[in-house]
């Protein structure tokens, strides 16, 4: 089965589908007045279980592999290779319950712990602790997590090395409480405050009207350092945030925005316009 879609400027897109209605080949032909046409194609391959196994791109007669996927006997993603190179391969590991426990590759490595690791043991699928390392970096970074009685995140305690104990709290985050609707009432964020100094960047208190945020106050005036970001407490008023009847944000005094107007786009999504 083949379908065609025509667009302005003489672009033609054709799609060939498999018998299970998945795209097998998507071909784009680009034409313009006075120019030679250009055709590119994406080819999708599937394994015996109809799972995506390879994505290839063809342009000017040259075909390259964009991605290749392999699955284990339980149908879980086992590995992913990008750009036809094992150098960009990532492997995935799971525990007996099917929960993801690790991602390993040359560009990024991550380990997730539930009832093992350095955080309080969790047996319901919530992450107790996690560690990661980017590329060839020697530093292993991680977080230990704690939860309240309703299994809502309370603390994400930062640390380095496999034990998540070195340089503790440099980038920790703490939720100070929840309201009866499950909205957070306060948030503390730590980060870099100087060339070699770390400390509390934000100590935020949230005021809500129902489930809509109406005010944010920050008890810390310390500015973030370098590329770190901290909340900018640009106002101190009862109604720092306002909304229209559809729930769209119409005012954000902390960013100096006093009025946001919306129109209705062709795809029925409200788009903000600055007056």
Say what each PLM segment does.
Residues 1-270, 274:
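Acidic/glycine-rich beta-solenoid
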